[in-house]
Design a protein with these regions (language model features):
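Residue-level signal for inorganic ion chemistry
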Residues: 55, 195, 220, 261
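Active-site HxH/HxHxD metal-binding segment of metal-dependent hydrolases
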Residues: 26, 46-128, 150
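Histidine-centered divalent metal-coordination motifs
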Residues: 73-79, 137, 195, 257
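C-terminal regulatory/interaction regions
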Residues: 222-279
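Conserved beta-strand hairpin/beta-sheet module of binuclear metal-dependent hydrolase folds
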Residues: 3-63, 143-155, 160
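Short Gly/Pro-enriched turn/cap motifs at secondary-structure boundaries
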Residues: 21-22, 113, 133-135
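Aromatic/hydrophobic pocket-lining residues that form the small-molecule binding cavity
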Residues: 80, 176, 180, 254
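Metallo-beta-lactamase
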Residues: 39, 46-49, 128-219
Length: 279
């Protein structure tokens, strides 16, 4: 299985194992951040043997400093699957946002997980990480600021190679756009995503993400104005040549945008489940 352990600075190591398992999305990253006397890990990938071995190799490369914290950016399996193995190896505390706690425990089992709040700081000895709550991709997605390197670890809020998915069932499009603006307000130079390579043009990438969402919303509003009234019709209009493996994801994105428009009072859901603009 393909393995990459890459030091992107004296402080940060990127750990990636495997091949893409979804069109356009690279394998999940783990990010190891080393201070002078302890270190922290951001996300744990799926937790398969090769991923855990790669983590141990990277950990050894920083002198096996005590691993004080494992920060989970959100609830999805490809970011939390290694919790038990890494906790058992290191004794680290597991941290997540309150909104993700129940889902993570349900997925992984009875593991004690500490809940963090916006602005929580973790001191690693000369290195400080700050938690940024950035809901949207999921209700409890978070990012992590490493201010001294002008770097934000973004989980799946911003990806290395594509736009991210906003679930209409456990995420929120309005929150997501607000979170993108929050990340931009921190003025990072670089972004370390949950999938893909380091992003070195942070402001440009964030602007592109915001622009994409505004554009997608405008195309939905235009289609509704033209008389297209349901998700099937919107899907055909907006995604005429999409890879079939992404069809359900695209439908979910349409629904997420519609949910936002409904919450803003710009669109109504009719009794038959169709949608219409509010004049």
């Amino acid at each position: 299985m393909k393995k990459s352990i890459k030091k992107i600075s004296n402080i940060v190591t990127q750990i990636t194992v495997g091949e893409p398992d979804f069109p356009g999305v690279s394998p999940p990253n783990m990010w190891l951040v080393a201070g002078f006397d302890r270190c922290a890990l951001i996300d744990t990938a799926y937790g398969n043997v090769d991923e855990i071995d790669a983590f141990v190799e990277a950990w050894n490369s920083v002198g096996s400093l005590p691993l004080s914290d494992v920060i989970l950016t959100h609830r999805h399996r490809d970011h939390i699957g290694g919790i038990r193995s890494i906790r058992d190896i290191s004794g680290a505390k597991i941290l997540c946002a309150p909104e993700e706690h129940a889902s993570i425990v349900e997925e992984i089992g009875d593991v004690f997980i500490n809940q963090v709040t916006d602005g929580t700081k973790l001191h690693l000895g000369g290195v400080t990480l700050e938690i940024l709550l950035t809901p949207g991709h999921t209700f409890g997605s978070l990012c992590v600021l490493l201010d001294q390197e002008s770097l934000i670890f973004t989980g799946d809020t911003i990806l290395g190679g594509s736009t991210t998915v906003i679930s209409p069932y456990h995420g929120d499009m309005s929150d997501y756009i607000d979170s993108l603006r929050k990340i931009k307000s921190k003025n990072p130079k670089n972004l370390a995503p949950g999938h893909g390579e380091l992003i070195t043009d942070a402001s440009k990438r964030i602007d592109a993400y915001i622009k994409h969402r505004i554009y997608r919303e405008s195309t939905i509003v235009k289609a509704l104005d033209e008389g297209i009234i349901d998700i099937d019709g919107l899907f055909i209009k907006l995604y005429p040549k999409l890879d079939s493996r992404l069809h359900q994801t695209a439908r979910d994105q349409i629904l997420s945008h519609l949910n936002k428009l409904v919450s803003e009072g710009r669109v109504q859901v009719k009794n038959d489940g169709t949608y219409g603009l509010i004049a």
